[in-house]
Amino acid sequence: MKFDKSILREADIRGVYGTQIKPAFATRLGLVFGSYLKTINVKTVVVGHDNRIGGVELSKNLVDALTSTGIDVIFIGLVTTPILNFASRELGVEYGIMVTASHNPACDNGFKLFGKNYQHCDYDELKIIYDALSNREYKIYTGKGTIKNLEINDLYSKRMRESISLGNRKMKVVVDPGNGTASIIVKKIYNRFPFDVVFINDVSDPTFPNHHPDPNVKANMKQLCDAVIEHSADLGLAYDGDADRCGFVDNNGEVIDADILMALMCKNILKTSENKTVLIDVKCSNTLRDEILACKGIIYLDTPSSAKQERDMEENNIVFGGGYSNHIFFRDKHPGYDDGIYVGLRVQELLSHTKLNLTDMLKKLNTYYHTDEIKVKTTDELKFKIVDAI
């Protein structure tokens, strides 16, 4: 079939729903992915979708196509991307597809493909799938796969509570799902904790009417900053559209960059872990590097690709990692996938064991001056050419 190949990205598929990403494309993807799985003797795949426009339609076409190739589908419905990652591990099913465009504009949708070791499909697998999408000669298998509908959210929220060990400190937190997919689960999770919680923008709405759910853009954090001050909260947390990232606001209503937050977490993690390696990306500040070295840690420098970071952490047995984009990974008492809600809870766990507020803790770190991330607008076609040239 013909389609705009610019939707095929380094780690996932994303484009405008209705023009670049259509239900017919989901059908083709399901046929190709299912047929590829048959060639490597994989029998089952987990499928979920976030709250974006078109998610239900894309999922239906995807699932129908997968089963028509003989693949069994465990369909978990409306979930965050981390819940799909969780479900795959609980079920022992490595391969999965999440219908999402993450933090892209509200008009977009797409697909994240997961494979070996429950991680994003690597370059070699994606190349096979991407090439096959437009290859009429690619063999499409036929069969009669089954569909099992599974509710996994309750078990996910239960596991969240079990994984967090709180101290005696009582805390107030403001949580902003940004009308994204975290809206469907975050209250259920926080009901299991003794926190005083204020929720804002907590109704699922794929048009994102209050602000875009991308915590890496400080303008999107203004409502949260104001709410933290208004409610005298200890912490503010915001998630992106599919909740694999978390943004942070301190008790003074100031946004904390992800690398600075990681610097706070390092000491706590490295003091109890025999593994002292921490993965950071090239955009992280010297504040984080200083803290890792002060804790006698080892720095593993990586690219800003969260999919690659997750694989590198697994392959090199790295205990903690992340980058400036707010993707953060724990592998001390967590499987290591990026989960914004879990990251926020780990920060609260840390705070619950100290009398210091977040601002005072930040003052103990070395300070360096830097510019905010600068992004230059260009077309997808030009963007990829520029990156290749560099």
Where are these regions (language model features)?
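An N-terminal, well-structured beta->alpha segment
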Residues: 1-64, 68-69, 95, 149-172
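General beta-strand structural signal in soluble alpha/beta enzymes
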Residues: 9, 47, 73-77, 98-99, ...
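N-terminal small/polar loop signature for handling phosphorylated ligands or for N-terminal nucleophile
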Residues: 39, 44-109, 189-249
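Glycine-rich phosphate-binding loop
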Residues: 93-102, 108, 228-250, 255, ...
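Gly/Ser/Thr-enriched, mixed-charge loops and adjacent short helices
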Residues: 109-231
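Phosphate-binding and adjacent anionic-ligand microenvironments
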Residues: 273-390
